[in-house]
């Protein structure tokens, strides 16, 4: 049994290890659009990746020293209430701003400059929303329900009262997330303002029809992939809804006893959220260009190559995770079923998704932030000469730290989940082995992608 002092030493060791690795090399974030080449690492890639995978394995061994249940519970149950007097006002103002922003984005996409970096629609959607606002969902709190313009509009429309089939569960949101990212990768959605405005209009129309048919609460809870992404990211954030009001908690601690992941569709969505960010970065690597080139040269259409890669890669990610759940029943013999273990250990993966998203987009957001401001100030004519920031060479070390920090947080959350599930300490520790192996694999792949120079996806 570890004392609080021992646990503090373990935590300090983890932080020191992450910071040491962060200083070992540099890597630049990349995004699905407006890409720029990143710098190479200053250390051999094989050593970088091996060390990154080893630190996750070592962190698991260190975390196993914290076996005092009362100490673990004290960390995850720490809460501080926050004042919520501004809640109703915030929702009203947020929904109004959201509707205005939606209309403005569509108008700017149609009537604004054709150059992506000068068009406010492109800059607001990709830089302001999907990079900046998405980061705030897991770094601060999930404010999307209060801002979502489509939720605000549909909440004021009559509903048809149709019954949503329970058997579908969260699967429509899984398909929707994969489809959205696929379209974003294979089309000039991030470079063509007209296409972006059209796509947003189609998405809005589908959402309005669906929400009116089954009711906004059911639609945004089960079907809408964007709402689910932000809701899941919000569980990583230090501020969230505690039932009776907003509360401050330690980052990621809301993942330990989360009941929203209660079916195979929810598990599949968590894995999909990890996979789509990985896929978005994978297709910008030179290795992918070589593989895709070989297949396209053999006569296979490029879109088919990307589609198969998206579906097959997701199938591998999901299959590996499900196999880990089945294997956990053998490493820690238990009456709990593999699907139940899969549901219990899925929320920690959201810390991985958040860490990689932060590494993937923070540099992109900071680089294009001045251009975003300039585009908003000149929505129709566009800025004459958009300015992009040049990040210092050491910034790449932060990206490495974000990936590793996300994985270490995921391991700690999985540790708490295991101790909540199993009464025996050894059983709780052994149940984590397969899931930690999966996390090490995800870490190694993520670090490799971050380490690679960023190229435009080929053959598109």
PLM features: what roles do these ranges have?
Residues 2-250, 255, 279, 403, ...:
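Transmembrane-helix bundle segments that line or gate the permeation/cavity pathway
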Residues 47-53, 153, 169, 303-316, ...:
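Hydrophobic alpha-helical transmembrane segments
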Residues 220-326:
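Long, internal scaffold/assembly segments composed of regular secondary structure
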Residues 277-285, 318-326, 352-378:
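Transmembrane alpha-helix/helix-exit interface in multi-pass inner-membrane proteins
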Residues 327-359:
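Alpha-helical transmembrane segments with an aromatic anchor "belt"
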Residues 338, 413-439:
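Interfacial loop-to-transmembrane junctions
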Residues 349-356, 367, 371-405, 411-415:
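Hydrophobic alpha-helical transmembrane segments and adjacent short intramembrane/lumenal linkers
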Residues 445-460:
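Juxtamembrane boundary at the C-terminal end of a transmembrane helix
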